[in-house]
Amino acid sequence: MEYFAESYDVIVIGAGHAGIEACLAAARLGVKTAVFTINLDWVGNMPCNPSIGGTSKGHLVREIDALGGEMGKAADKYTLQSRMLNLGKGPAVHSLRAQIDRREYSQGMKHTLELQENLDIRQGEIVDLYRLENGEWQVKTKLEALFNAKAVIIATGTFLGGRVYIGDVSYESGPDGMFPATELSKALKKLNIPLRRFKTGTPSRVNRKSIDFSNLEEQDGDEETVPFSFETQTPPKNKVCCHITYSNEKTKQIILENLDRSPMYSGKIEGKGPRYCPSFEDKIVRFKDKERHQLFIEPCGLETEEMYLQGLSSSLPEDVQLAFIHTIPGLEHAQVMRTAYAIEYDCVDPTALNATLEFNSIKGLYGAGQFNGSSGYEEAAAQGLVAGINAALKIKGEEPMILDRGGSYIGTLIDDLVTKGCTDPYRMMTSRSEYRLVLRQDNADVRLTPIGYKIGLISQERYDKFISKEEMVKAERERIEQKSIPLTDALQKIMEDCGTTPLERGCKMIELLKRPQITYKALTSVDDDRPDLPRAVFEQVEIAVKYEGYIKRQEQQIKEMRRIECKKIPADIDYYSLKGLRLEAVEKLSKIKPENLGQASRISGVNPADIAALNIILETL
C-alpha cells in the first residue's frame, strides 16, 4: 500500500560517482537532499577498473576538486599506486592516474554521505517518477513509499534497464551482480524522455596467488607522487606494484575461432559500445595484423587477492574466456574469480538537456553520468557535481553555474554532450578541447576555485590558501624576471648536462627557463636566493614561462569564443518563423535549443551561413 514518507528539495536517484557529487553539492549548498541507491554497501562502486584519473580524466578530477567536489580527496585517501602519465609530452596532456582500493573507497564515500548535513541516504529502488500539479516531483520506491522533491537528478549509471551478456547467457542485472532498475525506464518513457541502449563491459578478475609473476614486467608508481586534491597536504604513498603482460597468436586464434559465440558479433547486443574502450575480441578483429596487445594486471585492494586484467574486457562465453586467458604469459594457471561480461543499459539522448544538465522541456529534472551517454567514473562525477550545484541554485533562486569550453574540461564535456550529442558512450580526451594548453590540470584551481568559492562550496580557509598560493606564483614570476645569473663554469655545466647550447654571457633567469631543455630544478645550484616553494607553485611558474606565447594565443581565442557566447538566444524563439535559415538548421536548432550563438555554431548540421543569418536576426530582436 502506498504511503507518503517525506519531502525534500532535491532527490538524487543513484549513488554512483555522479550521484555522490550531486547529492553532496546540493546538501552542502544548504538544500534538503536525499540520495537513493539500490545497494547501500556499494556506494561509489568501481565495477570496472579500480582506478581514478588517467589521460584527460585526471584533469576532470582536479577540476571537480577545484570546484569543491569530493572525488579527488577520496582518491588521495585510498590510493594504492600513483603515476603521472604522458610526462614525455607537453604539460597540457600530463594526467594523474591512481590505482584505488575499491572497497575502501566505496566505504569511505558512504561514510562521507552519512556524515553530511542536509543529506539523507536511503537504500531503495525508485520505480516511478511523475510531476505533481504544484510543479514538484514525486518518486515512488519499490516498497511503495512516496517522496516529494522540487528537483530530481537521475544518476542511474548502468543499472537502468541493465542486462548482462556472457556468450549465449543473458539476464537482467546491474553491475557486479546487483539488482537492475527495470521499472524506472517505463516511467521515463511516459515523460517522453528519449532513451536509447548503450553497452559497456568489464574484464575478468583473477586470484593473485594463481598468477606467475616471475616473467612479468613490473610497473612501479612514481618516486615523487602528487595528490589529486589541492587540499591534500601529504602526497599519497605507493603501496602496490602493477604488472604488464601481452597476448599472443594463440590468444588471437582462440578469439577468432569463437567469434560466432560472441553476443556482440551475433547481434544479440543491440547497444552501442564505447569507441575508445573496445572489448578484447573487438580489438582482435579491428587489428588483425597486430601480433600482441599490452595488458595490465592491477590489484583491486589491500585486503583482497582479486586482480583486475585491464585490456581484457569481453562478453565471450566463460569457457572461451578461460581458454584465452590461459594462453597469456603469467596467467597460464590463473584462477578466474569473476567472469568478464558486457552490460547493456538505457540512457538518454543528452541533446534533450541544457548546459545546467536540466531537461530542456521538463523543468526540475536533471541528468548526470552514464545516464547522459558518457562513460567513465570521472566524467560521471563531473556531471553529478554540475547537476547538483544547479539544482540547488535554482531552488535557492540564484543564477545557474554554466561552465564554458574555454574555462574547463567539465565545460567541454557538457557542451559536447548537450550540443553535439553522442552515438556511443562519450569519453573525455584532451584532444576534445581547443584550449588544452590553458586547461591544464596544474591550474585547475586558478580557473575554477573562485567559482566554487562564489557558489559556496569552497570554504573561506581554503580560499585564503588559494589566494596565498597565487601570491607566491606572482612573486616568484617577478623574482625570476629580475634575477640575473652570471656566466660561471657551474652554469655552463648545467647547459651541457641539459643538452642546450652554451652561453656567451650571463642573463636573466627567465631567459634560461624559456629554453625547452632547462627546468626550474636544474637551475637550483646557481639560483642562490631561491625561496623554498611548494612544487605546485614553481611548476605553474615554469609552465607559464615556457609556453607564454602559446598560452596568450589560446587566451585570445577564448576571448573571441566568449564574445560569441555572450549573444544569448531567447528560450522561446520560434526557428520555423525565421527567414534565412535552412530547414536542417531549423530542425536542429529547434531540437537542441542552444542558449547562445556560440553553442548554435557547434551543432552538427548548422553551417556558418546559418549562424550569420541567426546573428542578424538576434540583433533585431
Stretches found by the model and what they are:
Residues 308-374, 402-415, 534-588, 593:
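A glycine-rich dinucleotide-binding beta-alpha-beta segment and adjacent secondary-structure elements
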Residues 6, 142-151:
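Core beta-strand elements of the Rossmann-like FAD/NAD(P) dinucleotide-binding domain
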Residues 57, 84, 186-322, 419-492, ...:
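An anion/pyrophosphate-binding glycine-rich loop and adjacent beta-alpha core
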Residues 3, 24-132, 143, 155-172, ...:
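Conserved N-terminal/central alpha/beta ligand/cofactor-binding core
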Residues 380-401:
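Internal hydrophobic alpha-helix adjacent to the cofactor/substrate pocket in enzyme cavities
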